[in-house]
Amino acid sequence: IVPFLLGMVPKLICLITKKC
């Protein structure tokens, strides 16, 4: 579960801040 969360966080930040 932890690796999954670590993979999702950057994607969420990317979507929210529009910085990909």
Swiss-Prot record:
Q: Which residues form the signal peptide?
A: none
Protein location? Secreted
Per UniProt, the keywords (alphabetical) are: Amphibian defense peptide, Antimicrobial, Disulfide bond, Oxidation, Secreted
**Disulphide bonds in the chain:** C14-C20
> Which InterPro entries would you find in this protein's record?
Antimicrobial_frog_1
Q: Tell me which residues bear Methionine sulfoxide.
A: M8
Task: List this protein's GO terms for biological process.
Answer: defense response to other organism
Major localization listed first in the record, in broad terms: secreted
Q: In which tissues is it expressed?
A: Expressed by the skin glands.
GO CC, sorted alphabetically, is: extracellular region
What is known about what this protein does?
A: Antimicrobial peptide.
Q: Which family does it belong to?
A: Belongs to the frog skin active peptide (FSAP) family. Brevinin subfamily.
Protein name as annotated: Brevinin-1ITb
